[in-house]
């Protein structure tokens, strides 16, 4: 039995040398020795005919032969596959000095560019950026902002209600009142931005979803002059230092007094056109009380900007729907720096 096993080892290595460069022949050799009815299986069957004293030695030799064949075949298969892969790579003649493909990259959306520009301005002035929920309770969306039950803004035709107590926020002021409560009567300077939702009929200038950015300052000795100076900073940042603005009285339930800000545009014929860009005002005393501020000690101002409206005026866009159409031909016009080359 031992002599037979030694001959089989020699036979295996001889066959291996002849077939080591052909993967299919290596698979045949594998099956010949290790298959269900292969040579090793037949050897194992012969063990039962051996005397008991020889079975142990013969069994060890068969197991050694099996492990030797498995290890050697696996090693040769891996070597052959690796050599085949290397040969294939060499045949492709890759030139590593060639420039890489110029993959297309996107750029910052024009609405986000406006938001980032405003945020950079207010960060330089010491403001904090805050974020909040798009699904809000009636309490934080309306009641905290001096809009009690029965107020027109709470009517079903103006808002997207989820249930009797929740809705899609109609402004980002929900972020402000939550931050006011969290500060527990201490001064704050924040801006917040995000999507808001109102039941408008979609057309060239209106959308049921749009972007809004709001600012809020609460401190001692805050007055209308501070608000006006802040509004001038915004318009200069967005439209240039020479841009003239016009303030006119308005009404918002959460500010008193309230104003709307118009850009003053001088036409070629010398006449002036007024384009509304934002609303603002001094924080209503009741809103301060709702958030545990003493209106006798603290005052504040707030402003809200419709980002799409700013972008439409700044870039002379005629249809608000262009911002959401995902048309590369439109968006590439606003790509900054070298990004424009990647479209």
Swiss-Prot record:
InterPro entries: aa-tRNA-synth_II (IPR006195), aa-tRNA-synth_II/BPL/LPL (IPR045864), Phe-tRNA-synth_IIc_asu (IPR004529), Phe-tRNA_ligase_II_N (IPR004188), Phe_tRNA_ligase_alpha1_bac (IPR022911), Phenylalanyl-tRNA_Synthase (IPR002319), tRNA-bd_arm (IPR010978)
Molecular function via GO: ATP binding; magnesium ion binding; phenylalanine-tRNA ligase activity; tRNA binding
Gene3D superfamilies assigned: Bira Bifunctional Protein, Domain 2
Gene Ontology biological process terms in this record: phenylalanyl-tRNA aminoacylation
Record's keyword terms, sorted: Aminoacyl-tRNA synthetase, ATP-binding, Cytoplasm, Ligase, Magnesium, Metal-binding, Nucleotide-binding, Protein biosynthesis
Required co-factors: Mg(2+)
Keyword field contains Ribonucleoprotein: no
Cofactor: binding details: Binds 2 magnesium ions per tetramer.
Catalytic activities: tRNA(Phe) + L-phenylalanine + ATP = L-phenylalanyl-tRNA(Phe) + AMP + diphosphate + H(+)
Main location: cytoplasm
SUPFAM superfamilies attached to this UniProt entry: Class II aaRS and biotin synthetases (SSF55681), tRNA-binding arm (SSF46589)
Enzyme class: ligase
Family affiliation: Belongs to the class-II aminoacyl-tRNA synthetase family. Phe-tRNA synthetase alpha subunit type 1 subfamily.
PANTHER family, alphabetized: PHENYLALANINE--TRNA LIGASE, MITOCHONDRIAL, PHENYLALANYL-TRNA SYNTHETASE
Protein name: Phenylalanine--tRNA ligase alpha subunit
UniProt source species: Aster yellows witches'-broom phytoplasma (strain AYWB)
